[in-house]
Amino acid sequence: MLERTLRVLEYDKVKEQLLEHTASSLGRDKVKRLMPSTDFEEIVEMQDTTDEAAKVIRLKGHAPLGGIFDIRSNVKRAKIGSMLSPHELLDIASTMYGSRQMKRFIEDIVDNGAQLPILETHVAQIVSLYDLEKKITGCIGDGGEVLDSASDKLRGIRNQIRTAESRIREKLENMTRSSNAQKMLSDAIVTIRNDRYVIPVKQEYRGVYGGIVHDQSASGQTLFIEPQVIVELNNALQEARVKEKQEVERILMMLTEEVAAEADIVLANVEVIANLDFIFAKALYAKRMKATKPIVNNERYMELRQARHPLIDPKVIVPNDIVLGKDFTTIVITGPNTGGKTVTLKTVGICVLMAQSGLHIPVQEESEICVFKNIFADIGDEQSIEQSLSTFSSHMVNIVDILEKADFESLVLFDELGAGTDPQEGAALAISILDEVHNRGARVVATTHYPELKAYGYNRNQVINASVEFDVNTLSPTYKLLIGVPGRSNAFEISKRLGLSERVINRARNHISTDTNKIENMIAKLEESQKNAERDWKEAEELRKQSEKLHRELQRQIIEFNEERDERLLKAQKEGEEKVEAAKKEAEAIIRELRQLRKAQLANVKDHELIEAKSRLEGAAPELVKKQKVKVKNTAPKQQLRPGDEVKVLTFGQKGQLLKKVSDSEWNVQIGILKMKVKESDMEYINTPKQLEKKAVATVKGRDYHVSLELDLRGERFENAMMRVEKYLDDAQLANYPRVSIIHGKGTGALRQGVQDYLKNHRGVKSFRYGDMGEGGLGVTVVELK
C-alpha cells in the first residue's frame, strides 16, 4: 500500500485507537507494525482469528493478559551470561505465569464446547515452565527482594546480621540513655552513616567516646561518631553484609542460568503471547466500535451494509449502504461541497484497509469485502510549498501516478476530481480520467461538484451516479447516500430560505438553460421518489420481521403445548398401568392364598370361582390401558382433499382448514391464526364445510352440555388463554350464539391485545368491540359471531 494512501485515509489514527486495547508492550509493538495484507487466504484467516477472539470476549468479557512483559532482551542477556536483576527475573516469572494462564483459559472454553480452532492452535504452542516460574517466585519476593528462603546459607547470614544489628543498637541506646549523655549528645538517637551505626556527639565532647568520626553536621557543631566499643561489632556486621551480597549474587546467577537453559522456549512463548495480545486487542476494538466480521470474497465486489466511519462519533455518524462491483464498478457522487461526500469516500477506503488488516469493520452483519492489490486515494489539499505547486498541480501529480499504476485489482478514490482549475476544463478532465480508470477495470469511487458529471452514469455501462441528501428545511446535509440519484446544488432553495427575494431568484433562474432546469427538477423528483421508496421498504421490512417473529413464537408454543400434552398423557398412562399391575399382583396373591387354603381343606373353593375372581379383577383395569392395547385399523377410503376442507393435523393434534396445495404432497393449512405447510400424510380429513346453509344447521349436544355466554380469562397465562379462546369460539359457534363476551381484565393490556389480535384473524368472527359501561368497559371484549 502507498504510504500516502494510508495517510490520507487516516489509517494511523485507527491504529492509535487499536493501541488502547493492548495489554502489553508486546501487543503494542505488533499494532505499530500492522499493515494491510493483499493475500486473500491470509486475510480470511486473520478475520477468522479476530472473530474467534470476539467470541471469547462475548462469552467471558475479557482475556487474562495481565502481567505480560517484553522480556526478550532480558532473556537474550541471560543467554550470553549476564546476571539478571531480581525485577528482571520477576518479569520473566510473571510472563511465564500469564502465558500459562492464557493457555488454560482458552483450553477451558474449548472443553466447555466452544469451537476455537485457531486460538486452540496458538495456545497449544505455549510450553509450561512451571518449575522455573516457581523457583524464581520462591527466591524473590514481590518487591524484588531476595528472600531468606532462597538458600539456607542466606538465611544463616541474615540471622547473623540481625543479631549484630541488635547488639549494636542495644549498646548505643544504653549510651544515649545515660544521664551524662544528655549534655554530650546533640540528640539522643542512633543513626547510620556510611553503612555504620553512629551517634550525634557535640564537637566539644569529641574525645569522650573515642572511635571513628564518619560525618559532621553542616554547622560543624555535631560529629557523627562510631564509638570505640562498637567498632568491632560494626566490622563484623559489614563482613556479614558482604557475605550476604555474595550469596544473593550467587542465587541471582543461578536463576539466570536456569532462564538461559530455557531461553528458546521462553522466547517462543513470548511470541505466542504477543500474538494473542494483538488478536484480543482487535477483538476488543471491534466490540468498542460494534463492528462485525465481513465476508471476504475474491469476486471483486463489496457490499457494505450500514457502513460507518470508525473515527467519527457513532452518535452523530449516519450509516450508509455502499455497493460496488456487482451492477456497477464506478460510483460518481455529485453535489455541493460540505455535503458529506468526502466522509463517504473515506468510509469506503478505511473499511477496506481495516478488513485487509484483519480488523472487523463498522458495518452490519453479512457485509462483504474483496481484496485489492492496490488502493489509491487522491483526497484533500496536498499543495507543496517547496515545489511551488498549486492545488490543481499537486492533485494532478498524484493522479498521473495513479493512472500509471491502477489496474483491475485496484480501488481508486478521487475527491473533488478536476477541482482547482477552470470549471469547464476541470469537468472535461474529470470525465476523461474517470473513463481511463473505469476502462482498466478498477473499482472507482469519485466525488465532484461539477454539474457536467451529473449525467455521467446514464450513458456508460457499469457506472452510476450518487449524491448525499441535503435537507433544504434545515439548510444542512443529512449525510444519507442516495445511489442512482445525482446531486443538485440547492442554491436557489437555500437562498430563498435565507431571505433572498423571489424577484432575484427568478431572474437567476432565467440565466440557467431550460435543459439544466429540467435536469434539476428531474433530480428533485428522483430524490423524493427514492426517499418514499426507502420509507415504504423499511415499513414493509419491519412488518415482515414482526410476522416472522410471531410465526416462530406460535410454532414454538404449539410444539410446547403438544409436547406437554403428550407428556401428561404418557404420565397418566404410566400411572394407570402401575395401578393395574398392582391390582393384578394382588389378584395373583389372593388366588395363591385361596389355593393354599383349599389344599389345607380349610376352604371349599372351586377352580371356576378362582378364574371368575381373576376376570373380575382384570375388568377393573382403566379404560386408558385397554384402549392402548386395541389398535383399530382405519379402513375408510382416502378422501380427495380440496381447499376449504377441515382436517386434523396429527403432529399437533389440532384442527385446521386447507388453504392451498403447494406440492404433490403438501398443503398450506390455517391452524387458528397460524399458517404452515403440512404433508398430506400428517392430516386426517374431518369434513367439508357447507356454504351458507345456516338456517338448516342443527346442533345436537348431550343433555349436560352447556356453553357459557362469557369466557373469563383473568389470571390466565397468555398461551393458555389463547387456546381457551380458540376452543370457546368453536363451541359458541356450534351452539349458534350470535354474541359472546370475553373477560380479559385491564391490567397491562397484553392479554387484551392478544385476544383482539386473534379475533381479527378468526373466520367465525363478524366484529368485536370493547364492552359498554354496564358490560365491563375496557376489561371486556364483546364478540359478534357470523
Swiss-Prot record:
SUPFAM superfamilies tied to this protein: DNA repair protein MutS, domain III, P-loop containing nucleoside triphosphate hydrolases, SMR domain-like
GO BP annotations, alphabetical order: mismatch repair; negative regulation of DNA recombination; rescue of stalled ribosome
UniProt cross-references to SMART domains, sorted A to Z: MUTSac, MUTSd, SMR
HAMAP family cross-referenced by the UniProt entry: MutS2
Family the entry assigns: Belongs to the DNA mismatch repair MutS family. MutS2 subfamily.
Function in brief: Endonuclease that is involved in the suppression of homologous recombination and thus may have a key role in the control of bacterial genetic diversity. Acts as a ribosome collision sensor, splitting the ribosome into its 2 subunits. Detects stalled/collided 70S ribosomes which it binds and splits by an ATP-hydrolysis driven conformational change. Acts upstream of the ribosome quality control system (RQC), a ribosome-associated complex that mediates the extraction of incompletely synthesized nascent chains from stalled ribosomes and their subsequent degradation. Probably generates substrates for RQC.
Annotated protein name in UniProt: Endonuclease MutS2
Natural source organism: Bacillus cytotoxicus (strain DSM 22905 / CIP 110041 / 391-98 / NVH 391-98)
Gene giving rise to this polypeptide: mutS2
